[in-house]
From Swiss-Prot:
Highest taxon above the source species: Eukaryota
Subcellular location(s) per record: Nucleus
The entry's keywords: DNA-binding, Metal-binding, Nucleus, Repeat, Transcription, Transcription regulation, Zinc, Zinc-finger
Zinc finger (C2H2-type): 151-173, 207-229, 235-257, 277-299, 305-327, 333-355, 361-383, 389-411, 417-439, 445-467, 473-495, 501-523, 549-571, 577-599, 605-627, 633-655, 661-683, 689-711
Location of the region described as Disordered in the Swiss-Prot/TrEMBL record: 515-548
UniProt keyword annotation of Nucleus present: yes
Gene3D superfamilies: 6.10.140.140, Classic Zinc Finger (3.30.160.60)
GO terms for biological process, alphabetical: regulation of transcription by RNA polymerase II
Pfam family, one: zf-C2H2
Protein name, as recorded: Zinc finger protein 840
Protein species of origin: Homo sapiens
Start and end residues of each KRAB domain: 42-113
Source taxonomy: Eukaryota, Metazoa, Chordata, Craniata, Vertebrata
Signal sequence segment: none
One of the record's GO cellular component terms: nucleus
Gene this chain is encoded by: ZNF840P
Amino acid sequence: MSLMGHGKVEMLLYAVPLLKAPNCLSSSMQLPHGGGRHQELVRFRDVAVVFSPEEWDHLTPEQRNLYKDVMLDNCKYLASLGNWTYKAHVMSSLKQGKEPWMMEREVTGDPCPACQPALATFRALNESGNAFRQSFHHGEYRTHRTFVQHYECDDCGMAFGHVSQLTGHQKIHKVGETHEYGENTRGFRHRSSFTMLQRICTLYKHFECNQCGETFNRPSKVIQHQSMHSGLKPYKCDVCQKAFRFLSSLSIHQRFHVGNRVNLTRHQKTHTQRKPFSCNFCGKTFHRFSEKTQHLLIHTRKKYYTCNYCKKEFNPYSKFILHQRTHTGEKPHKCDVCEKSFKSISNLNKHQKTHTGEKPFSCNECKKTFAQRTDLARHQQIHTGKKSFICSSCKKTFVRLSDLTQHKGTHTGERPYQCTTCEKAFKYRSNFTKHQKTHSIGRPFACNECGKTYRLNWELNQHKKIHTGEKPYECGECGKRFNNNSNLNKHKKIHTGEKHFVCNQCGKAFSLNSKLSRHQRTHNKKENSSKSVSNLNKHQKTHAGEKPFPCNECKKAFAQRMDLARHQQIHTGRKPFICSSCKKTFVRLSDLTQHKGTHTGERPYQCTTCEKAFKYQSNFTKHQKTHSIGRPFTCNECGKTFRLNWKLNQHKKIHTGEKPYECGECGKCFNNNSNLSKHKKIHTGEKHFVCNQCGKAFSLNSKLSRHQITHNKKKP
């Protein structure tokens, strides 16, 4: 006989003594004399033990006879309470030796004989919710009964619908403590019954999950529990193919297909009704009193599992296990596609929808779909147009409080989230979390054009628009197009004149937060200072000569990871960015953008001190430092001073005569690579710099600049 069936025989042996115990009936269960409170029904199913056909086949004849005797005793005791309506036909079935599952069908139905409500069984009611009020309104059924677990065990927190069930359950704790046949067990008719109950205590929570350590009293419970770890969902709905871990979950789901709308009707009321029932502990409100009652268990139920790290208490054990993973960092549930790990199976299931593209939640207004119900709920607030949360600084309004809280950080400039690896700081936790992934996970999505890699597929798709020239976002005012929506929104502020970002020191307003941040540095400007702690650390590496990022191809080292990434593109030999004027190709888009300025001759960056103009902001920034900071690096040979150490080292080659850069065509040597590159154009005949007035071409931009002076030269 299976262990499960054997456990039921043990349960069977103390089913009758529980009813026979002197304290098993509460005052609410006594027969009233006259008016007063209604009598609460104790029914056959509350104490019956039912075997499946498979389990019944494994019982011996002696055990089957024992079953019949005990169940007949149960019938007698229930009948003695005066309110059991199944006495005659159930006792007849027992005497005839009917199988237990046949009797269960006879006694589990509890319909009103007059109106036959479509609520089939007490078990179905329990599965559809912890509390359900059913009104019996005909004849002897005129009794209000609430299937709520009112009676709670002080030892383990387990709740029961009837005090008799609680009394019987508490004997398990008493027997577990005494292990003696004495006063606590006086309700048992036979010592053998007590001996069987002792075996329940020894088997209680004997079967342990080998993944999380949770224990169970039956192997079937362990198997059911372990499906949470494996993600296995063996029960599939024939109608919609949705899969479930448990058969009971499938049964509940199938009611939606067959027309049982009890739960749907109850749910729809949540959209129309107010919530009059409030929790005195936390203030949470509920539609129904039964929901409040169930919620109160969170505050009142004893919590047995204490976290060793933070001393927080949890119940049940599964919540305790999930909480501990926040301290240990354990993530046992791994995605098969990208190998990302999660603390719980529910988070893994949510994540997997990002790979499948499944978006089952659709907005009724705009038909946009979402992977998560919470994302849909957030989106739907957009359609209401209601923006209840107002920023006190700039009067901008927001749909959600969380958006307002994030926005306020733009006015204060506070960056509370700092990366411990590179010391970069962030205003928002979401950006900080994304940044941390750059240190821990790879970049599996690579661009076929330039080889640049990305962590997320949507980032790659956005990048590809640079190569294709696709700009689907058009400004309605001026027709200018952009490759992403965020750049379009920034541009629109030019037309609206909207300037929500105000400097708290001088009152100047800006359309973008980035412009405000740049402006605020002018107030806090100090010599040799950097924009942030992270930039200061980067700057200090230039003095120390520290270059921790080496190239695997040529072993050249760099002070910044970003510089290494730019350098590595040289080894691929790919130059996907082409100048439309001279057809010269570049590794990076920024290089192409800078190069285009050489054709126009435009110099938009002008120094206010000496009025010297520059094509590129980087050269302009370097030039400004010549006016503001010293030149600490001095040549010992000629006394010439330099701002940067590498420039001094380059200068020293003039004195030593060192010329390590040799031309492969003519053998001429140079002391730096830039001079060699200029020289090579003599051999190639390359003349990319064309005068826009006479069409003459030059190999160097400096020669073009000198030539253009001749066109602008005027006689006095």
